């Protein structure tokens, strides 16, 4: 379906029309206990079941009128348009995979060029093993010293979480600089899609690029309304990045008049702002915080006269902050009702990380039964997806999706 703008996201809850996903692939099969921590996984999901669960996720979306787009298809369409773009993409991917020797670079180029574009993209995500390049021999010191390491190019298992590499804001996007080196290759795909894909090139303003020197991740970016954007200052996103995004949005005269920077704890439990709260209805949010916990927030606004950004700081309860800037009292539904045992367990399994597909309609993990029951009692329509394997990646339905089109509310 064609839309007036290829990116249009002015809320967290407007009816979802088009969404970007990545279906788990062989990258999960290349995770091993010795490298999973470095690749930001706490456990190894079973691929066959993870795919079944992800298919169920996509089916829920499609059954509710959402067009599902897969990132591997978008990037394949992008680089198939022009041989020079494909050549450039392959060279950049190999370089950013840490390959520096001429012989190994050429061996990988030959390997990738002998595949279809779709198979090549799948293999880039899955990782390249020594067995894949059986004919490649090297007497370099680095190759010999690391002879027991089975991978030449590491897998990209975190690309499952399409929320983070770029973020849709209004009619534009931020193409993010990821905090961890192992995730930075993921944003190459977004860079090429928005630069060369016929639907997106020349039609999508870029609010932030992956070449910036400060970090920003999509899990910290929440579009609260046409006027208000929230960004977390977190373990993964730096305060300087918030200012850069704010300045771009203000200078380009977008509808966003206030950027709220939330300073959250620097810990894995609060990895991104969407682990602290997500919006599920006009005035209803899920959260994983205590009633008396106060946040330091910084409200960034623009002075048209001087062309400068004004920053006002305040410390208040989350519900008071959201209520003030949204203009109405809000309701906070705590993960598992705030129960010390159920709340901690269900937060670990992303009980508060919901994906709104329309106001008052959310996709959740089936396993978080206490939180799900509370949502239903509150009148929220809950679509439950299986998650025994996907939850091992420590990301919920919101983490695994990037809205491209939402209806206005």
Curated annotation (Swiss-Prot):
Q: What class of enzyme is it?
A: hydrolase
Species per Swiss-Prot/TrEMBL record: Borrelia turicatae (strain 91E135)
Q: What are the alphabetically sorted keywords of the record?
A: Arginine metabolism, Cytoplasm, Hydrolase
Molecular function GO terms recorded: arginine deiminase activity
- The active site consists of 399
Name this polypeptide is given:
Arginine deiminase
Please name the SUPFAM superfamilies in this protein's record: Pentein
The family annotation for this protein states: Belongs to the arginine deiminase family.
BP GO terms, sorted: arginine catabolic process to ornithine; arginine deiminase pathway
Q: Please name the pathway.
A: Amino-acid degradation; L-arginine degradation via ADI pathway; carbamoyl phosphate from L-arginine: step 1/2
Which catalysed reactions does the entry list for this protein?
L-arginine + H2O = L-citrulline + NH4(+)
State the compartments where it is located: Cytoplasm
What's the Enzyme Commission number for this chain? 3.5.3.6
Highest taxon of source: Bacteria
For this record, an example GO cellular component is: cytoplasm
């Amino acid at each position: 379906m064609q839309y007036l703008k290829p990116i249009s996201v002015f809320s967290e809850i407007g009816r979802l029309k088009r969404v970007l996903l990545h279906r788990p692939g062989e990258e999960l099969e290349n995770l091993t206990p010795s490298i999973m921590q470095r690749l930001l996984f706490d456990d190894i999901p079973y691929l066959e079941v993870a795919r079944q669960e992800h298919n169920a996720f996509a089916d829920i979306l499609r059954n509710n009128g959402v067009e599902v787009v897969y990132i591997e298809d978008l990037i394949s369409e992008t680089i198939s348009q022009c041989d020079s773009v494909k050549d450039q993409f392959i060279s950049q991917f190999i370089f950013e995979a840490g390959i520096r020797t001429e012989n190994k670079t050429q061996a990988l180029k030959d390997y990738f060029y002998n595949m279809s574009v779709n198979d090549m993209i799948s293999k880039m995500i899955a990782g390249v093993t020594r067995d894949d390049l059986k004919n490649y021999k090297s007497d370099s010191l680095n190759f010999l010293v690391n002879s027991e390491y089975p991978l030449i190019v590491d897998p990209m298992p975190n690309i499952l979480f399409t929320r983070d590499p770029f973020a849709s804001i209004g009619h534009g996007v931020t193409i993010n600089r990821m905090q961890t080196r192992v995730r930075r290759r993921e944003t190459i795909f977004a860079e090429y899609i928005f630069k060369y894909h016929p639907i997106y090139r020349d039609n999508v303003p870029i609010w932030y690029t992956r070449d910036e020197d400060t970090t920003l991740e999509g899990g910290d970016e929440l579009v609260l309304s046409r006027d208000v954007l929230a960004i977390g200052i977190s373990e993964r996103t730096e305060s300087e990045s918030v200012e850069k995004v704010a300045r771009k949005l203000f200078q380009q005269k977008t509808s966003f008049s206030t950027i709220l920077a939330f300073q959250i704890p620097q810990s894995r439990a609060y990895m991104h702002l969407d682990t602290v709260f997500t919006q599920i209805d006009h005035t209803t949010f899920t959260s994983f915080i205590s009633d008396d916990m106060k946040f330091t927030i910084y409200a960034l606004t623009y002075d048209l006269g001087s062309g400068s950004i004004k920053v006002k700081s305040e410390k208040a309860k989350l519900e008071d902050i959201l209520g003030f800037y949204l203009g109405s009292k809000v309701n906070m539904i705590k993960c598992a009702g705030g129960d010390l045992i159920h709340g901690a367990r269900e937060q670990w399994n992303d009980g508060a990380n919901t994906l709104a597909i329309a106001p008052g309609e959310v996709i959740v993990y089936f396993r978080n039964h206490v939180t799900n029951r509370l949502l239903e009692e509150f009148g929220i329509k809950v679509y439950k997806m299986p998650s025994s394997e996907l939850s091992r990646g420590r990301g919920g339905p919101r983490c695994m999706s990037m809205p491209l089109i939402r209806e206005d509310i």
